[in-house]
């Protein structure tokens, strides 16, 4: 593998994907402390919203400690060099949420959809570009589509105005060959000036390896979280990826040791439980289950007295996707009845 002299844009997920691991209960003080540390380390992009994106505060997805407006208005004025991004899932977030984020100073909007449903993003991607924002099409659960079919969905997002397309391994299911094939096809099939990104989860302990493979295949943006704070077994641990990529001769412009310090001294003490590859998160990666289902499944398992891994395996067999959180309890009830 040769990634020497490649320029990589790192994007930290602690304050968005990390919300899942914190049951969306990150305080404003914690958010401020971590965001300023990441900014000081040179991380160029930091995502800040509810775990399920703008408008995610709900019974279905969980109520955060604060509103998106409070989080964004607290963090954005403190940034010296980092830009703040926000995730938006059509059907959860609306164009009004998008406008609110723009007015508060968000620089990047990432419009996310199930990898087969890019057509639902047209309104939001188009508006984001009209507002002059860095606009990302975020294709979730990308393992569920073959590379050429994924490219067709990516081309739709590109046609709506997205200047960057993400291959998103929401389940932490992909192996390195899966990543290489998809990123290569996207790089070859999209416009040369359309950037490619990769978002990994560490459910099979492949977050770093898959992200390096993505860079080798042509990805320029890489998502991760300091100390891996995120759904499932966490996102690609950003401080580890940064150290490895730097050793391999790539350029991130992120201070290796300051990012390590942010992970060790700020993120780890924030954790409600250790972010690691345990049995349940390994099942997520093995069965291809949406990573943010993990804590929902654990709660349903406790409530109905059934093994959480049985719930997750069934969800994988059903090929459930993000947005179907209500089915987790249905599966648990049916498993309890069948015992």
Swiss-Prot record:
Signal peptide: none annotated. GO terms for biological process: catabolic process; L-leucine biosynthetic process. Substrate binds at residues 16-17, 170, 199, 290. It catalyses: (S)-4-hydroxy-2-oxopentanoate = acetaldehyde + pyruvate. Residues 8-260 form the Pyruvate carboxyltransferase domain. Its EC number is 4.1.3.39. It is an enzyme of class 4 (lyase). The keyword Amino-acid biosynthesis does not apply. Transmembrane segments: none annotated. The active site is at residue 20. GO terms for molecular function: 2-isopropylmalate synthase activity; 4-hydroxy-2-oxovalerate aldolase activity; manganese ion binding. Mn(2+) binds at residues 17, 199, 201. Keywords: Aromatic hydrocarbons catabolism, Lyase, Manganese, Metal-binding. InterPro entries: 2-IPM_HCS-like, 4OH_2_O-val_aldolase, Aldolase_TIM, DmpG_comm, DRE_TIM_HOA, PYR_CT. The record marks 16 as: Transition state stabilizer. CDD domains: DRE_TIM_HOA. The keyword Lyase applies. HAMAP family: HOA (MF_01656). Belongs to the 4-hydroxy-2-oxovalerate aldolase family. This is 4-hydroxy-2-oxovalerate aldolase. It comes from Shewanella woodyi (strain ATCC 51908 / MS32).
């Amino acid at each position: 593998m040769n990634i020497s002299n490649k320029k990589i844009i790192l994007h930290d997920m602690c304050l968005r994907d990390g919300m899942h691991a914190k049951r969306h209960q990150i305080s404003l003080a914690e958010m401020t402390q971590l965001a300023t540390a990441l900014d000081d380390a040179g991380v160029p992009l930091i995502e800040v919203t509810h775990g399920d994106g703008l408008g995610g505060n709900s019974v279905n997805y969980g109520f955060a400690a604060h509103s998106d407006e409070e989080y964004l208005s607290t963090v954005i004025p403190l940034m010296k060099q980092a830009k703040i991004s926000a995730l938006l899932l059509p059907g959860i977030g609306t164009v009004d949420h998008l406008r609110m984020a723009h007015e508060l100073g968000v620089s990047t909007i990432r419009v996310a959809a199930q990898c087969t449903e890019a057509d639902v993003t047209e309104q939001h991607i188009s508006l984001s570009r009209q507002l002059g924002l860095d606009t990302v099409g975020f294709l979730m659960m990308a393992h569920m589509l073959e590379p050429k079919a994924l490219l067709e969905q990516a081309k739709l997002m590109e046609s709506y105005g997205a200047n960057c397309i993400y291959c998103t391994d929401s389940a932490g299911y992909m192996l390195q060959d899966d990543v290489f094939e998809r990123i290569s096809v996207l790089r070859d099939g999209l416009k040369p000036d359309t950037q490619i990104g990769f978002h990994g989860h560490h459910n099979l302990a492949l977050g770093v390896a898959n992200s390096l493979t993505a860079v080798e295949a042509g990805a320029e943006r890489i998502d991760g979280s300091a100390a891996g704070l995120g759904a499932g077994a966490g996102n690609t641990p950003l401080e580890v990826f940064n150290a490895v990529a730097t050793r391999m001769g790539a350029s991130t412009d992120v201070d290796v040791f300051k990012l390590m310090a942010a992970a060790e001294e700020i993120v780890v003490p924030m954790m409600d439980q250790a972010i690691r590859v345990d049995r349940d998160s390994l099942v997520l990666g093995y069965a291809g289950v949406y990573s943010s289902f993990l804590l929902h499944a654990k709660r349903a398992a406790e409530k109905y007295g059934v093994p959480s891994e049985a719930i997750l395996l069934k969800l994988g067999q059903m090929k459930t996707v993000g947005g179907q959180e209500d089915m987790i309890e249905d599966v648990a009830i049916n498993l309890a009845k069948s015992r």
